[in-house]
């Protein structure tokens, strides 16, 4: 009898929850229509996986890619609409958030073709991989539009949990298991510190959780200059620092980059930074409006440490993925300059433009690593010597992406850095910009060193890996080359047409 009563209560509670969720989607679903498309794609993937066999693998890629492209299309159709706050203040839709959501969707769309051949060669479970990628993308999109402390915590946890699972996807690889363990432990620790900072904000504002209401609460309680706000600022900076991975919060980055499957690293290297940058700008700009001098100083220290340590340590690396890990630490230092400048002097517009270029440069380089690694099984920089003699397209595309990452004209990376540094200079960040210029010169050195190896034709320097190198006959090879071609074009052509891209970003934001 008791069991029947409990069972009926469970059914009633479940029905109420379902009806409430349906009610929210019915009246607020139009505000998260791009996210709803991804949710529908996830459900469709699960249904097809449970009713089909392994011969339907192409359908999994098709559904994932189509849902991402449709989500991008839905996002573009509502471009330039009036800002809307929905879900009882938990979610905000505006042009600023939508730009970051577009960048995250673009990352995921380009990463799926990179993964096709890798998944087939390593015989990884395809459905779960794509589910984790789409769910992480969904978490990143919700983080971009999060408008209260609870959503800002839950959304990145959704992204992080999928990231942990993806980084340890090759369970038989010892390095992958080690990377996942470090990633999980440090991620859990950083999340607890982030929540600790949120608790101080919540208490100091008189129990408010919405970002703008927190500012009003701090004014009402006269706590905006209290020690509690300083504790909250430091704790939240540490928590967000783990997601952005600037120095000194970068310890997990090289190990995770080296141990995780290469397509996963490509995905995490861009999406995590885009989502964390969107969250950082909103948190620092709104609740900490009265502490702008303090958080500017904290971010300046992080940017300087990142640019110096990231680029100097990258010189000493022998693994291509570890080198790119330290390079990404240096790159996030440049992005932080845009966060510090903010609305004034086009700081956000230049930051978003540079991140768009960084996505293409970084993913183009990782496409090369995926392709070369599948043919040779190595990640050592020395083993790339003489690749031009065997695969000119791969070597030339790699060289263009690396030169763009280094910031050499007339490539996209040069104009992106130039405008970012110019905005910082106009804002009075002279020391920070000077460090950025010097470390950019340092980065050119180790990028050129790799390009020299790629282009060498001396037989004594060519390794057995390149001598035995052969192109794969797999049809899916075209997907990697397609992604690489798109990324190479995006890393070169926008450099010539920088002004229109920047004008679009400025017009959209302001």
UniProtKB/Swiss-Prot annotation:
GO terms for molecular function: NADH dehydrogenase (ubiquinone) activity; quinone binding. The chain crosses the membrane at residues 24-44, 59-79, 99-119, 124-144, 149-169, 183-203, 229-249, 295-315, 323-343, 347-367, 395-415, 418-438. GO terms for cellular component: chloroplast thylakoid membrane. InterPro entries: NADH-Q_OxRdtase_suN/2 (IPR010096), ND/Mrp_TM (IPR001750), Ndh2_N (IPR045693). It is a multi-pass membrane protein. Keywords: Chloroplast, Membrane, NAD, NADP, Plastid, Plastoquinone, Quinone, Thylakoid, Translocase, Transmembrane, Transmembrane helix, Transport. Its EC number is 7.1.1.-. One of its GO terms (biological process) is ATP synthesis coupled electron transport. It is found in: Plastid, Chloroplast thylakoid membrane. Its main location: plastid. It catalyses: a plastoquinone + NADH + (n+1) H(+)(in) = a plastoquinol + NAD(+) + n H(+)(out); a plastoquinone + NADPH + (n+1) H(+)(in) = a plastoquinol + NADP(+) + n H(+)(out). NDH is composed of at least 16 different subunits, 5 of which are encoded in the nucleus. NDH shuttles electrons from NAD(P)H:plastoquinone, via FMN and iron-sulfur (Fe-S) centers, to quinones in the photosynthetic chain and possibly in a chloroplast respiratory chain. The immediate electron acceptor for the enzyme in this species is believed to be plastoquinone. Couples the redox reaction to proton translocation, and thus conserves the redox energy in a proton gradient. NCBIfam families: NDH_I_N, PRK02504.1. Belongs to the complex I subunit 2 family. This is NAD(P)H-quinone oxidoreductase subunit 2, chloroplastic.
